[in-house]
Amino acid sequence: MSAYLHCLSHTPLVGYVDPVAEVLAEVDEVVAAARARIAAFDPQLVFLFAPDHYNGFFYDVMPSFCIGMAATAIGDFHSLAGPLDVPRETAEACAAAVLEAGVDAAVSYRMQVDHGFAQPLELLLGGLAEKPVVPVFINGVAVPLPGFQRARLLGEAIGRFARSTGKRVLFLGSGGLSHQPPVPELAKVDARMADRLLGSGRDLPTDERQARQQRVISAAEGFVADQNSLHPLNPEWDNHFLDLLEQRRFAELDGLGNAELSALAGKSTHEVKTWVTAFAALSAFGPYQAHERYYRPIPEWIAGFGSLSAHSLS
């Protein structure tokens, strides 16, 4: 019984708005090294914690957390499309264990996911269906949002379940760090966009999806030229966050409110709760050692870009 973890920022802007070649090569090297370490660990079961960007989860029913019994990636921004290899019975047992632990997570037998799930599977495992994976959605953009404490408790519950399987388990966290790309807010949009956020956005026409993606690309180009055009990145907070994870002090984030986090680091920074959930899950295996920390603010990707591995010491 052993566990490994890797948390990684994701970005849909790769190949659309990229940093200079040296930075791109640096990130590629970090990802390749992480992929090699995961391959050497050879996980038998993967738990992937990731957010959504109004591609699979909408305000018709917006859970704080959702565990997938089956899942399909839509292939936005040239990410991979197709089904994930979800072990249904394991996912069902996990969902039951989480509820019994007092954490109210929804379930989905038809989960639709975007690049937030697909990108780490492609970059770190080589594809959507290379390993059995239980996908766990954590709401990171649609208010009202879950807080750090609930994310931590979810992770602890999933970690205890994962430990009970007796398998080599990989925990993946996807998202963050500090960033605030142009994401629509229900309280601030017109009726047509509100209808999209209420569920009609599940199956966007091709031209509308392309226009939506172009808005993000244009925002990134504008952010490179003027880093006050969006909420600025916050390397100081990002590195403090990484320190807390490395030092197993992530419970200290319980007292950080959602409004305060948005003000500090941007409204999409709530995606880092996937990292907290992953580290909390790993902690269920006992003490851990974090390693291979990487961080760089990358305005071209509108992100404080981070990568961090850890393994259980049991």
UniProtKB/Swiss-Prot annotation:
UniProt-listed SUPFAM superfamilies: LigB-like (SSF53213)
GO terms (BP aspect): 3-phenylpropionate catabolic process
Active site residues according to the UniProt entry: H115, H179
EC number of this enzyme: 1.13.11.16
Pathway where this protein functions: Aromatic compound metabolism; 3-phenylpropanoate degradation
A single MF term (Gene Ontology): ferrous iron binding
Ribosomal protein among keywords: no
InterPro entries found in the cross-reference section: DHPP/DHXA_dioxygenase (IPR023789), Xdiol_dOase_suB (IPR004183)
Signal peptide: none
CDD domains, per the entry: MhpB_like (cd07365)
Pfam family, one: LigB
Catalytic activity: 3-(2,3-dihydroxyphenyl)propanoate + O2 = (2Z,4E)-2-hydroxy-6-oxonona-2,4-dienedioate + H(+); (2E)-3-(2,3-dihydroxyphenyl)prop-2-enoate + O2 = (2Z,4E,7E)-2-hydroxy-6-oxonona-2,4,7-trienedioate + H(+)
Cofactor dependency: Fe(2+)
Keywords: Aromatic hydrocarbons catabolism, Dioxygenase, Iron, Oxidoreductase
Domain of life per record: Bacteria
UniProt record similarity statement: Belongs to the LigB/MhpB extradiol dioxygenase family.
Quaternary context: Homotetramer.
HAMAP family associated with the record: MhpB
Role noted for this protein: Catalyzes the non-heme iron(II)-dependent oxidative cleavage of 2,3-dihydroxyphenylpropionic acid and 2,3-dihydroxicinnamic acid into 2-hydroxy-6-ketononadienedioate and 2-hydroxy-6-ketononatrienedioate, respectively.
Protein name: 2,3-dihydroxyphenylpropionate/2,3-dihydroxicinnamic acid 1,2-dioxygenase 1
Native species: Pseudomonas putida (Arthrobacter siderocapsulatus)
Gene transcribed to yield this protein: mhpB1
